[in-house]
């Protein structure tokens, strides 16, 4: 993989990983022209995106750790931990069952379309409720489950699934739902990336990697994800997610069309 392709894929990952539009769908399209990505490359660009969100929320994370004696912080942290543990346990079950990701774009396209329709419904339902910021235990449990659903059905979007489950479960404030979804995603994605990294090294998958290309992709993904998430957090203060829902539906239809015409597998 040349350095320009590595940078382009880093940009795509950085933009799409935490926006509710599915990084998987975009990377599949890019793969048709930029070549197949190794497991190591996928891990590296995702790690860059996770680092960006960690940097954005470092003060919030530090407050939760240092202020653990405060009931509000302790309660919030406990809900984050429970959501993460639910994802971790269900993730191990999915691995044990031998679940395999789809090899064609069609299921991903349908996940994009259905997810887009679901997002519009969730926004409509949330608008009919008081815009409170409370994260309930039900929200925490459902967010943990939603992360696994997004992993099992690529194209769903982890951020999209978790944010809109939180909205439907009673957190009527978009900013509060997004923050909880992103904070849960930090340990979840670090754990998943760490697991895959160890597995890749164990299987010899790191041999022959172009470490310069990996470094470029990592740095680009980190910078772009930082900008994208900062923009998203500002955007949702006064705007709904409807624009993303429409975009998902259009992308899903485009993928179905490209599959039907043989442009992609």
From Swiss-Prot:
InterPro entries per record: UppP (IPR003824)
Pfam family, one: BacA
Further remark: Bacitracin is thought to be involved in the inhibition of peptidoglycan synthesis by sequestering undecaprenyl diphosphate, thereby reducing the pool of lipid carrier available.
Transmembrane residue ranges: 38-58, 80-100, 107-127, 135-155, 175-195, 213-233, 244-264
Lineage: Bacteria, Pseudomonadati, Pseudomonadota, Alphaproteobacteria, Hyphomicrobiales
Family per record: Belongs to the UppP family.
Recorded name of the encoding gene: uppP
Gene Ontology CC, one term: plasma membrane
Main location: membrane
Record-given protein name: Undecaprenyl-diphosphatase
């Amino acid at each position: 993989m040349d350095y320009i392709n590595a940078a382009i894929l880093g940009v795509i990952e950085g933009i799409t990983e935490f926006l509710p539009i599915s990084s998987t769908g975009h990377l599949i399209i890019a793969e048709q022209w930029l070549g197949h990505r190794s497991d190591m490359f996928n891990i590296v660009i995702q790690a860059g995106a996770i680092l960006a969100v960690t940097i954005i929320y470092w003060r919030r994370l530090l407050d939760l750790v240092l202020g653990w004696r405060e009931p509000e912080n302790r309660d919030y942290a406990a809900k984050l931990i429970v959501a993460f543990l639910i994802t971790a346990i269900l993730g191990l079950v999915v691995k044990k069952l031998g679940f395999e990701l789809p090899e064609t774009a069609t299921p991903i396209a349908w996940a994009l379309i259905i997810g887009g329709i679901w997002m519009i419904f969730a926004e409509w339902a949330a608008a009919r409720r008081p815009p409170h910021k409370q994260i309930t235990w039900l929200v925490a449990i459902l967010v943990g489950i939603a992360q696994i659903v997004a992993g099992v059905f690529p194209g769903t979007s982890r951020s999209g699934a978790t944010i809109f489950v939180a909205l439907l479960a009673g957190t009527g404030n978009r900013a509060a739902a997004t923050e909880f979804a992103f904070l849960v995603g930090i340990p979840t994605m670090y754990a998943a990336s760490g697991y895959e990294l160890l597995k890749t090294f164990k299987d010899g998958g790191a041999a022959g990697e172009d470490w310069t290309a990996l470094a470029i992709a990592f740095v680009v993904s980190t910078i772009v994800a930082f900008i994208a998430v900062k923009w998203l957090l500002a955007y949702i203060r006064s705007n709904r997610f409807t624009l993303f829902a429409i975009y998902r539906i259009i992308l899903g239809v485009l993928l179905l069309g490209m599959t039907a015409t043989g442009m992609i597998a």
